[in-house]
Amino acid sequence: MKNITDSFLCLGSWPSAGSFVFNTDILATNPINLSVVLGVLVFFGKGVLSDLLDNRKQKIWRTIQNSEELQEEAIEQLEKAQARLRKVETEADRFRVNGYSEIKREKLNLIHSIYTTLEQLENYKNEAIDFEQQRVINQVRQRVLQQALQGALGTLNSCLNNELHLRTVSANIGMFGTMKEKNN
């Protein structure tokens, strides 16, 4: 501590301006040099430091403002996305409900169509059976009639002889002749 006070006392006892002396006491000169350098730095560096701090403050302020703007935009986009999501979910629910009702309606239509087709097939089957029965009945009638005619023809052929045949033909010719005379 004595050295520091000695160095300040030395300042008062410096030689006049005409002479220049080097102070070789390093411990005494360093605090003086440091105080001078710090004084010069504070005096001249105050403006630079102030400008640097102002610039840094402005950059930080702009960064904060940009961050707030980005945050607001992100919030808006999030709200829009949530609104779109709600809309899509609503549409999906509507499509799901409509889809289920459409499936039920199609199912009922298909069941109705199947029942209608089954009824038509049943009607076609019954018509085919009726038609086949009529055809079989007609065939049976034709055969019975054919057999009856063959039996009657056979009976007539066995009962008719030539004389009876000639008499029948003559009687029929006579009937035709009388009918002809009446018409004239």
UniProtKB/Swiss-Prot annotation:
Q: Which CDD domains match?
A: ATP-synt_Fo_b
Tell me where it resides: Plastid, Chloroplast thylakoid membrane
Task: Quote the cellular component terms of the Gene Ontology held in the record.
Answer: chloroplast thylakoid membrane; proton-transporting ATP synthase complex
Q: Which residue spans adopt a coiled-coil conformation according to this UniProt entry?
A: none
Q: Which residues cross the membrane?
A: 27-49
Q: Can you provide one Gene Ontology molecular function annotated for this UniProt record?
A: proton-transporting ATP synthase activity, rotational mechanism
Q: Keywords on this record?
A: ATP synthesis, CF(0), Chloroplast, Hydrogen ion transport, Ion transport, Membrane, Plastid, Thylakoid, Transmembrane, Transmembrane helix, Transport
Q: Which Pfam families match?
A: ATP-synt_B (PF00430)
| Cited InterPro entries | ATP_synth_b/b'su_bac/chlpt (IPR002146)
Topological type in the membrane = Single-pass membrane protein
Misc:
In plastids the F-type ATPase is also known as CF(1)CF(0).
Subunit (UniProt): F-type ATPases have 2 components, F(1) - the catalytic core - and F(0) - the membrane proton channel. F(1) has five subunits: alpha(3), beta(3), gamma(1), delta(1), epsilon(1). F(0) has four main subunits: a(1), b(1), b'(1) and c(10-14). The alpha and beta chains form an alternating ring which encloses part of the gamma chain. F(1) is attached to F(0) by a central stalk formed by the gamma and epsilon chains, while a peripheral stalk is formed by the delta, b and b' chains.
UniProt xrefs under PANTHER family: ATP SYNTHASE SUBUNIT B, CHLOROPLASTIC (PTHR34264:SF3)
Q: Which family does it belong to?
A: Belongs to the ATPase B chain family.
Question: What biological function has been recorded for the protein in this entry?
Answer: F(1)F(0) ATP synthase produces ATP from ADP in the presence of a proton or sodium gradient. F-type ATPases consist of two structural domains, F(1) containing the extramembraneous catalytic core and F(0) containing the membrane proton channel, linked together by a central stalk and a peripheral stalk. During catalysis, ATP synthesis in the catalytic domain of F(1) is coupled via a rotary mechanism of the central stalk subunits to proton translocation. Component of the F(0) channel, it forms part of the peripheral stalk, linking F(1) to F(0).
User: Any idea what this protein is called?
Assistant: ATP synthase subunit b, chloroplastic
Q: Which organism is it from?
A: Phaseolus vulgaris (Kidney bean)
